[in-house]
Protein backbone atom coordinates (compact mmCIF):
# COMPACT_ATOMS: atom_id res chain seq x y z
CA UNK A 1 0.00 0.00 0.00
CA UNK A 2 1.26 3.47 -0.91
CA UNK A 3 0.94 6.57 1.27
CA UNK A 4 -2.29 8.15 -0.04
CA UNK A 5 -1.18 11.74 0.56
CA UNK A 6 1.98 11.19 -1.49
CA UNK A 7 -0.07 9.99 -4.47
CA UNK A 8 -1.77 13.41 -4.71
CA UNK A 9 -0.36 16.24 -6.77
CA UNK A 10 0.62 19.47 -5.03
CA UNK A 11 -2.67 21.22 -5.75
CA UNK A 12 -4.63 18.28 -4.37
CA UNK A 13 -2.40 18.10 -1.30
CA UNK A 14 -2.88 21.78 -0.52
CA UNK A 15 -6.62 21.51 -1.10
CA UNK A 16 -6.94 18.59 1.32
CA UNK A 17 -4.67 20.18 3.94
CA UNK A 18 -6.71 23.38 3.83
CA UNK A 19 -10.09 21.80 4.52
CA UNK A 20 -11.62 23.00 7.78
CA UNK A 21 -14.92 24.87 8.11
CA UNK A 22 -16.88 25.50 11.29
CA UNK A 23 -20.36 24.18 10.53
CA UNK A 24 -23.57 26.00 11.44
CA UNK A 25 -25.90 24.41 13.96
CA UNK A 26 -28.62 24.64 11.29
CA UNK A 27 -26.74 22.00 9.28
CA UNK A 28 -27.65 19.49 11.99
CA UNK A 29 -31.39 20.14 12.28
CA UNK A 30 -32.16 16.47 11.57
CA UNK A 31 -29.52 15.42 14.13
CA UNK A 32 -29.00 11.62 13.96
CA UNK A 33 -32.15 10.84 11.95
CA UNK A 34 -30.26 9.69 8.85
CA UNK A 35 -28.94 6.68 10.77
CA UNK A 36 -32.16 5.82 12.60
CA UNK A 37 -33.32 2.32 11.72
CA UNK A 38 -29.90 1.42 10.35
CA UNK A 39 -27.60 -1.13 11.95
CA UNK A 40 -24.37 0.33 13.33
CA UNK A 41 -21.61 -2.09 14.29
CA UNK A 42 -18.59 -0.80 16.16
CA UNK A 43 -15.37 -2.80 15.93
CA UNK A 44 -13.41 -2.41 19.17
CA UNK A 45 -14.67 -1.41 22.59
CA UNK A 46 -11.98 0.66 24.26
CA UNK A 47 -12.47 4.21 25.52
CA UNK A 48 -13.62 5.74 22.22
CA UNK A 49 -15.54 2.67 21.13
CA UNK A 50 -17.54 2.28 24.32
CA UNK A 51 -18.29 5.95 24.93
CA UNK A 52 -19.25 6.78 21.36
CA UNK A 53 -21.50 3.72 21.38
CA UNK A 54 -23.19 4.73 24.63
CA UNK A 55 -23.91 8.19 23.25
CA UNK A 56 -25.25 6.88 19.95
CA UNK A 57 -27.53 4.41 21.73
CA UNK A 58 -28.85 7.19 23.94
CA UNK A 59 -29.48 9.17 20.74
CA UNK A 60 -31.82 6.44 19.53
CA UNK A 61 -29.45 4.52 17.27
CA UNK A 62 -29.07 0.74 16.91
CA UNK A 63 -25.52 -0.05 18.08
CA UNK A 64 -23.78 -3.40 18.58
CA UNK A 65 -20.15 -4.49 18.90
CA UNK A 66 -18.15 -6.88 16.73
CA UNK A 67 -15.12 -8.37 18.46
CA UNK A 68 -12.67 -11.09 17.60
CA UNK A 69 -13.93 -14.50 18.65
CA UNK A 70 -10.97 -14.89 21.01
CA UNK A 71 -11.90 -11.66 22.83
CA UNK A 72 -15.42 -13.00 23.32
CA UNK A 73 -14.36 -16.49 24.41
CA UNK A 74 -11.74 -15.18 26.83
CA UNK A 75 -14.04 -12.40 28.06
CA UNK A 76 -11.38 -9.75 27.56
CA UNK A 77 -11.90 -6.16 28.70
CA UNK A 78 -13.37 -5.10 25.36
CA UNK A 79 -16.03 -7.80 25.72
CA UNK A 80 -16.76 -6.80 29.32
CA UNK A 81 -17.06 -3.13 28.34
CA UNK A 82 -19.75 -3.89 25.78
CA UNK A 83 -21.53 -6.76 27.52
CA UNK A 84 -21.78 -5.12 30.95
CA UNK A 85 -23.36 -2.06 29.34
CA UNK A 86 -26.09 -4.15 27.76
CA UNK A 87 -24.94 -4.13 24.13
CA UNK A 88 -25.28 -7.00 21.70
CA UNK A 89 -21.80 -8.46 21.18
CA UNK A 90 -20.89 -10.87 18.41
CA UNK A 91 -18.11 -12.05 16.16
CA UNK A 92 -17.14 -10.29 12.94
CA UNK A 93 -18.81 -13.03 10.91
CA UNK A 94 -22.07 -12.71 12.85
CA UNK A 95 -22.56 -8.93 12.91
CA UNK A 96 -20.59 -7.30 10.07
CA UNK A 97 -22.65 -8.70 7.12
CA UNK A 98 -25.86 -7.02 8.39
CA UNK A 99 -24.26 -3.66 9.21
CA UNK A 100 -25.17 -0.49 7.34
CA UNK A 101 -22.31 1.36 9.04
CA UNK A 102 -19.19 -0.34 10.39
CA UNK A 103 -17.13 1.94 12.65
CA UNK A 104 -13.51 0.92 13.19
CA UNK A 105 -12.45 2.17 16.63
CA UNK A 106 -9.50 -0.15 17.22
CA UNK A 107 -5.93 1.16 17.83
CA UNK A 108 -4.13 2.57 14.77
CA UNK A 109 -1.69 -0.32 14.66
CA UNK A 110 -4.56 -2.79 14.17
CA UNK A 111 -6.41 -0.89 11.45
CA UNK A 112 -4.98 -2.62 8.39
CA UNK A 113 -5.59 -6.08 9.78
CA UNK A 114 -9.08 -5.17 11.01
CA UNK A 115 -10.18 -3.51 7.77
CA UNK A 116 -8.77 -6.31 5.63
CA UNK A 117 -10.73 -8.76 7.79
CA UNK A 118 -14.08 -6.95 7.91
CA UNK A 119 -14.18 -5.52 4.39
CA UNK A 120 -14.95 -8.86 2.66
CA UNK A 121 -17.80 -9.36 5.16
CA UNK A 122 -19.43 -5.96 4.54
CA UNK A 123 -22.52 -5.85 2.36
CA UNK A 124 -22.64 -3.98 -0.94
CA UNK A 125 -23.00 -0.23 -0.47
CA UNK A 126 -22.32 -0.17 3.27
CA UNK A 127 -20.36 2.57 5.00
CA UNK A 128 -17.06 2.35 6.87
CA UNK A 129 -16.22 4.85 9.60
CA UNK A 130 -13.00 5.95 11.29
CA UNK A 131 -12.20 8.34 14.13
CA UNK A 132 -8.62 8.82 12.92
CA UNK A 133 -7.56 8.71 9.30
CA UNK A 134 -4.05 7.26 9.65
CA UNK A 135 -4.98 3.99 7.96
CA UNK A 136 -6.39 5.78 4.93
CA UNK A 137 -3.86 8.61 4.59
CA UNK A 138 -0.56 7.17 5.78
CA UNK A 139 -0.99 3.45 5.14
CA UNK A 140 -2.96 4.03 1.94
CA UNK A 141 -5.58 1.39 2.69
CA UNK A 142 -7.24 0.23 -0.53
CA UNK A 143 -10.98 0.34 0.07
CA UNK A 144 -13.77 -1.23 -1.96
CA UNK A 145 -15.23 1.21 -4.47
CA UNK A 146 -18.82 0.57 -3.35
CA UNK A 147 -18.11 1.58 0.27
CA UNK A 148 -18.79 5.07 1.62
CA UNK A 149 -15.88 6.03 3.90
CA UNK A 150 -16.36 8.72 6.55
CA UNK A 151 -14.66 10.05 9.64
CA UNK A 152 -15.93 11.49 12.92
CA UNK A 153 -13.04 12.52 15.16
CA UNK A 154 -13.92 13.88 18.62
CA UNK A 155 -11.18 16.21 19.85
CA UNK A 156 -10.77 14.66 23.28
CA UNK A 157 -10.36 11.30 25.08
CA UNK A 158 -13.29 8.89 25.00
CA UNK A 159 -14.25 9.42 28.63
CA UNK A 160 -14.83 13.12 27.99
CA UNK A 161 -17.02 12.30 24.97
CA UNK A 162 -19.38 10.54 27.36
CA UNK A 163 -19.25 13.02 30.23
CA UNK A 164 -20.01 16.03 28.02
CA UNK A 165 -22.91 14.17 26.42
CA UNK A 166 -24.36 13.39 29.85
CA UNK A 167 -24.18 17.11 30.64
CA UNK A 168 -26.35 17.78 27.62
CA UNK A 169 -23.46 19.06 25.52
CA UNK A 170 -20.68 17.41 23.51
CA UNK A 171 -17.09 17.87 22.39
CA UNK A 172 -15.75 19.66 19.28
CA UNK A 173 -15.52 17.16 16.45
CA UNK A 174 -13.90 16.99 13.02
CA UNK A 175 -15.92 15.22 10.33
CA UNK A 176 -14.85 14.21 6.84
CA UNK A 177 -15.69 12.09 3.81
CA UNK A 178 -12.94 10.30 1.90
CA UNK A 179 -13.11 11.82 -1.61
CA UNK A 180 -12.27 8.48 -3.25
CA UNK A 181 -15.16 6.70 -1.49
CA UNK A 182 -18.53 8.43 -1.70
CA UNK A 183 -20.25 6.46 -4.49
CA UNK A 184 -23.83 7.37 -3.51
CA UNK A 185 -23.15 10.92 -2.39
CA UNK A 186 -24.41 10.20 1.13
CA UNK A 187 -21.10 10.53 2.96
CA UNK A 188 -21.83 13.87 4.58
CA UNK A 189 -25.31 12.76 5.67
CA UNK A 190 -23.79 9.73 7.39
CA UNK A 191 -20.95 11.69 8.98
CA UNK A 192 -23.26 14.42 10.28
CA UNK A 193 -25.70 11.91 11.74
CA UNK A 194 -22.90 9.95 13.42
CA UNK A 195 -21.45 13.17 14.88
CA UNK A 196 -24.90 14.20 16.12
CA UNK A 197 -25.32 10.78 17.68
CA UNK A 198 -22.22 11.38 19.80
CA UNK A 199 -23.37 14.90 20.73
CA UNK A 200 -20.56 16.57 18.83
CA UNK A 201 -22.90 18.89 16.94
CA UNK A 202 -23.78 20.63 20.21
CA UNK A 203 -20.18 21.72 20.75
CA UNK A 204 -19.40 22.44 17.12
CA UNK A 205 -18.31 20.34 14.15
CA UNK A 206 -15.66 21.23 11.63
CA UNK A 207 -15.98 20.04 8.06
CA UNK A 208 -12.49 18.72 7.44
CA UNK A 209 -10.68 16.08 5.36
CA UNK A 210 -8.91 12.84 6.20
CA UNK A 211 -5.62 14.48 5.22
CA UNK A 212 -6.06 17.63 7.33
CA UNK A 213 -7.13 15.61 10.37
CA UNK A 214 -4.19 13.21 10.17
CA UNK A 215 -1.40 15.68 9.46
CA UNK A 216 -2.54 18.20 12.09
CA UNK A 217 -3.31 15.50 14.67
CA UNK A 218 0.14 13.94 14.33
CA UNK A 219 1.86 17.30 14.62
CA UNK A 220 -0.05 18.42 17.68
CA UNK A 221 0.34 15.22 19.65
CA UNK A 222 4.04 14.85 18.93
CA UNK A 223 5.01 18.37 19.93
CA UNK A 224 3.02 20.62 22.26
CA UNK A 225 0.37 18.13 23.40
CA UNK A 226 2.63 15.33 24.60
CA UNK A 227 6.29 15.80 23.68
CA UNK A 228 6.62 19.23 25.25
CA UNK A 229 4.87 18.16 28.46
CA UNK A 230 7.19 15.17 28.75
CA UNK A 231 10.42 17.03 28.01
CA UNK A 232 9.38 20.01 30.14
CA UNK A 233 8.52 17.81 33.11
CA UNK A 234 11.81 15.93 32.98
CA UNK A 235 14.16 18.92 32.69
CA UNK A 236 12.22 21.15 35.09
CA UNK A 237 12.23 18.47 37.78
CA UNK A 238 15.96 17.95 37.33
CA UNK A 239 16.59 21.69 37.69
CA UNK A 240 14.56 22.01 40.88
CA UNK A 241 16.18 18.99 42.55
CA UNK A 242 19.68 20.18 41.61
CA UNK A 243 18.92 23.55 43.20
CA UNK A 244 17.70 22.10 46.48
CA UNK A 245 13.92 22.10 46.14
CA UNK A 246 12.21 19.28 48.04
CA UNK A 247 11.41 16.42 45.60
CA UNK A 248 7.78 16.03 46.67
CA UNK A 249 7.09 19.72 46.09
CA UNK A 250 8.97 19.80 42.77
CA UNK A 251 7.10 16.79 41.44
CA UNK A 252 3.70 18.03 42.57
CA UNK A 253 4.29 21.49 41.09
CA UNK A 254 4.83 19.86 37.70
CA UNK A 255 2.33 17.02 37.83
CA UNK A 256 -0.61 19.24 38.76
CA UNK A 257 0.79 22.51 37.46
CA UNK A 258 0.42 21.65 33.78
CA UNK A 259 -3.29 21.02 34.30
CA UNK A 260 -3.85 24.19 36.34
CA UNK A 261 -1.91 26.41 33.95
CA UNK A 262 -3.47 25.02 30.78
CA UNK A 263 -6.96 25.29 32.27
CA UNK A 264 -6.50 29.04 31.82
CA UNK A 265 -5.98 28.42 28.09
CA UNK A 266 -9.41 26.84 27.84
CA UNK A 267 -11.11 30.00 29.04
CA UNK A 268 -9.09 32.72 27.37
CA UNK A 269 -6.19 31.39 25.35
CA UNK A 270 -2.53 32.30 25.80
CA UNK A 271 -3.54 35.86 26.69
CA UNK A 272 -5.53 34.79 29.75
CA UNK A 273 -2.86 32.30 30.82
CA UNK A 274 -0.20 35.02 30.73
CA UNK A 275 -2.54 37.45 32.52
CA UNK A 276 -2.57 35.09 35.52
CA UNK A 277 1.04 36.16 36.19
CA UNK A 278 2.18 39.35 37.88
CA UNK A 279 3.54 41.95 35.47
CA UNK A 280 7.22 41.16 36.20
CA UNK A 281 6.51 37.42 35.90
CA UNK A 282 4.64 37.96 32.63
CA UNK A 283 7.57 39.85 31.14
CA UNK A 284 9.95 37.12 32.32
CA UNK A 285 7.75 34.33 30.93
CA UNK A 286 7.49 36.16 27.62
CA UNK A 287 11.27 36.54 27.37
CA UNK A 288 11.82 32.88 28.23
CA UNK A 289 9.22 31.80 25.68
CA UNK A 290 10.91 33.84 22.96
CA UNK A 291 14.21 32.11 23.74
CA UNK A 292 12.48 28.74 23.66
CA UNK A 293 10.87 29.50 20.31
CA UNK A 294 14.22 30.39 18.77
CA UNK A 295 15.84 27.26 20.18
CA UNK A 296 13.09 24.78 19.34
CA UNK A 297 11.72 26.08 16.04
CA UNK A 298 13.98 23.81 13.94
CA UNK A 299 12.80 20.76 15.89
CA UNK A 300 9.12 21.65 15.46
CA UNK A 301 9.65 22.26 11.76
CA UNK A 302 11.48 18.94 11.36
CA UNK A 303 8.57 17.06 12.89
CA UNK A 304 6.12 18.86 10.62
CA UNK A 305 8.28 18.12 7.57
CA UNK A 306 8.58 14.44 8.50
CA UNK A 307 4.81 14.20 8.99
CA UNK A 308 4.03 15.87 5.66
CA UNK A 309 6.53 13.73 3.74
CA UNK A 310 5.40 10.46 5.34
CA UNK A 311 8.83 9.81 6.85
CA UNK A 312 7.41 9.70 10.37
CA UNK A 313 4.76 7.15 9.44
CA UNK A 314 7.14 4.87 7.59
CA UNK A 315 9.57 4.97 10.53
CA UNK A 316 6.85 4.12 13.03
CA UNK A 317 5.40 1.34 10.89
CA UNK A 318 8.87 -0.19 10.64
CA UNK A 319 8.88 -0.31 14.45
CA UNK A 320 5.45 -1.97 14.37
CA UNK A 321 6.95 -4.64 12.14
CA UNK A 322 9.83 -5.03 14.62
CA UNK A 323 7.50 -5.80 17.56
CA UNK A 324 7.58 -2.20 18.84
CA UNK A 325 11.13 -2.58 20.09
CA UNK A 326 11.78 1.18 20.04
CA UNK A 327 8.40 2.12 21.49
CA UNK A 328 8.68 -0.34 24.36
CA UNK A 329 12.26 0.66 25.09
CA UNK A 330 11.37 4.36 25.21
CA UNK A 331 8.37 3.60 27.42
CA UNK A 332 10.63 1.81 29.90
CA UNK A 333 13.15 4.66 29.87
CA UNK A 334 10.38 7.16 30.60
CA UNK A 335 9.27 5.08 33.56
CA UNK A 336 12.77 5.30 35.01
CA UNK A 337 13.04 9.10 34.95
CA UNK A 338 13.34 10.94 38.25
CA UNK A 339 10.08 12.82 37.71
CA UNK A 340 8.12 9.60 37.26
CA UNK A 341 9.49 8.34 40.57
CA UNK A 342 9.29 11.39 42.80
CA UNK A 343 8.04 10.66 46.34
CA UNK A 344 4.40 11.39 47.10
CA UNK A 345 3.85 14.54 49.10
CA UNK A 346 0.94 16.01 51.04
CA UNK A 347 2.22 19.55 50.57
CA UNK A 348 -0.57 21.91 49.55
CA UNK A 349 -0.13 24.19 46.54
CA UNK A 350 -2.72 26.87 45.85
CA UNK A 351 -3.97 27.53 42.34
CA UNK A 352 -2.13 30.85 42.04
CA UNK A 353 1.09 29.30 43.37
CA UNK A 354 1.24 27.04 40.33
CA UNK A 355 1.48 30.17 38.20
CA UNK A 356 3.76 32.15 40.53
CA UNK A 357 6.27 29.32 40.95
CA UNK A 358 5.79 27.85 37.47
CA UNK A 359 6.79 30.81 35.30
CA UNK A 360 8.94 28.53 33.14
CA UNK A 361 6.01 26.16 32.61
CA UNK A 362 3.87 29.07 31.40
CA UNK A 363 6.69 30.03 29.02
CA UNK A 364 6.94 26.46 27.70
CA UNK A 365 3.20 26.33 27.07
CA UNK A 366 3.17 29.63 25.19
CA UNK A 367 6.23 28.70 23.12
CA UNK A 368 4.92 25.22 22.33
CA UNK A 369 1.43 26.30 21.34
CA UNK A 370 2.68 29.06 19.06
CA UNK A 371 5.42 26.93 17.47
CA UNK A 372 3.04 24.06 16.72
CA UNK A 373 0.42 26.45 15.32
CA UNK A 374 3.01 28.24 13.17
CA UNK A 375 4.51 25.01 11.81
CA UNK A 376 1.09 23.68 10.85
CA UNK A 377 -0.19 26.83 9.18
CA UNK A 378 3.08 27.29 7.28
CA UNK A 379 2.52 23.81 5.82
CA UNK A 380 -0.95 24.56 4.44
CA UNK A 381 -3.07 23.49 7.42
CA UNK A 382 -5.56 26.27 8.11
CA UNK A 383 -5.93 28.10 11.40
CA UNK A 384 -9.01 26.24 12.66
CA UNK A 385 -7.35 22.82 12.38
CA UNK A 386 -4.10 24.10 13.87
CA UNK A 387 -5.94 25.60 16.85
CA UNK A 388 -7.81 22.42 17.71
CA UNK A 389 -4.68 20.28 17.44
CA UNK A 390 -2.56 22.56 19.62
CA UNK A 391 -4.14 24.91 22.14
CA UNK A 392 -7.59 23.32 22.42
CA UNK A 393 -6.47 19.80 23.29
CA UNK A 394 -3.65 20.75 25.66
CA UNK A 395 -5.75 20.98 28.87
CA UNK A 396 -7.16 17.52 28.14
CA UNK A 397 -3.70 15.96 27.85
CA UNK A 398 -2.41 17.87 30.88
CA UNK A 399 -5.25 16.31 32.86
CA UNK A 400 -3.83 12.84 32.18
CA UNK A 401 -0.45 13.89 33.61
CA UNK A 402 -2.25 15.10 36.74
CA UNK A 403 -3.81 11.67 37.18
CA UNK A 404 -0.71 9.44 37.03
CA UNK A 405 2.20 11.46 35.67
CA UNK A 406 3.68 10.72 32.24
CA UNK A 407 2.70 7.05 32.49
CA UNK A 408 -0.99 7.92 32.37
CA UNK A 409 -0.51 10.32 29.47
CA UNK A 410 1.25 7.67 27.42
CA UNK A 411 -1.35 5.02 28.28
CA UNK A 412 -4.33 7.20 27.36
CA UNK A 413 -3.03 8.60 24.07
CA UNK A 414 -2.92 6.41 20.97
CA UNK A 415 0.02 4.17 20.10
CA UNK A 416 0.76 6.57 17.24
CA UNK A 417 0.81 9.56 19.58
CA UNK A 418 3.01 7.76 22.09
CA UNK A 419 5.61 6.88 19.46
CA UNK A 420 5.68 10.45 18.14
CA UNK A 421 5.89 11.84 21.67
CA UNK A 422 9.04 9.82 22.36
CA UNK A 423 10.62 10.87 19.05
CA UNK A 424 10.14 14.52 20.00
CA UNK A 425 10.96 14.27 23.71
CA UNK A 426 14.10 12.22 23.08
CA UNK A 427 15.55 15.17 21.15
CA UNK A 428 13.90 18.02 23.04
CA UNK A 429 15.01 16.82 26.48
CA UNK A 430 18.78 16.89 25.86
CA UNK A 431 18.39 20.06 23.78
CA UNK A 432 16.73 21.87 26.68
CA UNK A 433 19.05 20.29 29.22
CA UNK A 434 22.19 21.46 27.43
CA UNK A 435 21.19 24.68 25.67
CA UNK A 436 18.51 26.26 27.86
CA UNK A 437 18.22 25.01 31.43
CA UNK A 438 21.74 26.07 32.56
CA UNK A 439 20.68 29.71 32.12
CA UNK A 440 17.52 29.50 34.27
CA UNK A 441 17.14 29.37 38.03
CA UNK A 442 14.48 28.52 40.58
CA UNK A 443 13.05 32.03 40.46
CA UNK A 444 11.21 30.84 37.34
CA UNK A 445 10.65 27.23 38.35
CA UNK A 446 10.09 26.23 41.94
CA UNK A 447 10.44 29.33 44.09
CA UNK A 448 9.03 32.26 42.12
CA UNK A 449 10.15 35.86 42.01
CA UNK A 450 9.46 36.28 45.72
CA UNK A 451 9.76 39.81 47.03
CA UNK A 452 10.65 41.30 43.66
CA UNK A 453 9.00 44.66 43.07
CA UNK A 454 5.95 44.61 40.80
CA UNK A 455 7.31 47.62 38.97
CA UNK A 456 7.83 47.18 35.23
CA UNK A 457 8.60 49.47 32.34
CA UNK A 458 5.30 50.58 30.80
CA UNK A 459 6.57 50.50 27.24
CA UNK A 460 7.97 47.00 27.71
CA UNK A 461 4.73 45.69 29.20
CA UNK A 462 2.70 47.17 26.34
CA UNK A 463 5.06 45.56 23.83
CA UNK A 464 4.74 42.17 25.56
CA UNK A 465 0.95 42.35 25.78
CA UNK A 466 0.61 43.28 22.12
CA UNK A 467 2.89 40.44 21.02
CA UNK A 468 0.88 37.91 23.02
CA UNK A 469 -2.56 39.15 21.95
CA UNK A 470 -1.74 39.64 18.28
CA UNK A 471 -0.56 36.10 17.56
CA UNK A 472 -2.86 34.37 15.02
CA UNK A 473 -3.66 31.55 17.46
CA UNK A 474 -5.31 34.13 19.72
CA UNK A 475 -7.52 35.51 16.95
CA UNK A 476 -8.83 32.14 15.79
CA UNK A 477 -9.06 30.91 19.37
CA UNK A 478 -11.30 33.76 20.42
CA UNK A 479 -13.55 33.14 17.42
CA UNK A 480 -13.86 29.39 17.95
CA UNK A 481 -14.34 29.64 21.71
CA UNK A 482 -17.17 32.11 21.13
CA UNK A 483 -18.81 29.64 18.71
CA UNK A 484 -18.56 26.88 21.32
CA UNK A 485 -19.93 29.13 24.06
CA UNK A 486 -22.88 30.13 21.89
CA UNK A 487 -23.61 26.50 21.07
CA UNK A 488 -23.38 25.48 24.71
CA UNK A 489 -25.91 28.14 25.70
CA UNK A 490 -28.29 26.81 23.05
CA UNK A 491 -27.70 23.15 23.98
CA UNK A 492 -28.21 23.52 27.72
CA UNK A 493 -30.91 26.17 27.46
CA UNK A 494 -29.01 28.78 29.39
UniProtKB/Swiss-Prot annotation:
A GO molecular function held by the record: magnesium ion binding
Cofactor note: Binds 2 magnesium ions per subunit.
Residues where Mg(2+) 1 binds: 217, 221
Gene3D superfamilies: N-(1-d-carboxylethyl)-l-norvaline Dehydrogenase, domain 2, NAD(P)-binding Rossmann-like Domain
GO cellular component term, pick one: cytosol
Catalytic activity: (2R)-2,3-dihydroxy-3-methylbutanoate + NADP(+) = (2S)-2-acetolactate + NADPH + H(+); (2R,3R)-2,3-dihydroxy-3-methylpentanoate + NADP(+) = (S)-2-ethyl-2-hydroxy-3-oxobutanoate + NADPH + H(+)
Cofactor: Mg(2+)
Key words, A-Z: Amino-acid biosynthesis, Branched-chain amino acid biosynthesis, Magnesium, Metal-binding, NADP, Oxidoreductase, Repeat
KARI N-terminal Rossmann domain location: 14-208
Binding site for substrate: 414
Pfam families on file: KARI_C, KARI_N
Annotated GO biological process: isoleucine biosynthetic process; L-valine biosynthetic process
Annotated KARI C-terminal knotted domain residues: 209-344, 345-487
Positions of NADP(+) binding: 45-48, 68, 76, 78, 108-110, 158
Enzyme class: oxidoreductase
Domain of life the protein comes from: Bacteria
Residues given in the record as Mg(2+) 2 binding sites: 217, 389, 393
Function: Involved in the biosynthesis of branched-chain amino acids (BCAA). Catalyzes an alkyl-migration followed by a ketol-acid reduction of (S)-2-acetolactate (S2AL) to yield (R)-2,3-dihydroxy-isovalerate. In the isomerase reaction, S2AL is rearranged via a Mg-dependent methyl migration to produce 3-hydroxy-3-methyl-2-ketobutyrate (HMKB). In the reductase reaction, this 2-ketoacid undergoes a metal-dependent reduction by NADPH to yield (R)-2,3-dihydroxy-isovalerate.
Family, as annotated: Belongs to the ketol-acid reductoisomerase family.
Protein name: Ketol-acid reductoisomerase (NADP(+))
Organism annotation: Vibrio atlanticus (strain LGP32)
Amino acid sequence: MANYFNTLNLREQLDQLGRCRFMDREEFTTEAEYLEGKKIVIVGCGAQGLNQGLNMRDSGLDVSYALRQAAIDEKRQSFKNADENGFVVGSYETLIPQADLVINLTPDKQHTNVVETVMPLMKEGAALGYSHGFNVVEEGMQLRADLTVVMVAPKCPGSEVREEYKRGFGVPTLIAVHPENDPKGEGWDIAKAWAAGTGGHRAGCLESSFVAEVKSDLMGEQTILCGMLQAGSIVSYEKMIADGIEPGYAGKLLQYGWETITEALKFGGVTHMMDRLSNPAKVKAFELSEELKDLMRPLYNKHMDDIISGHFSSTMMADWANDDVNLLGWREETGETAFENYPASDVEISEQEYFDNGILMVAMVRAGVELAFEAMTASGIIDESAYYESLHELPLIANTVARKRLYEMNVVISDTAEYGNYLFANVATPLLREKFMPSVATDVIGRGLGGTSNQVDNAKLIEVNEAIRNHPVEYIGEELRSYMSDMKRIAVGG
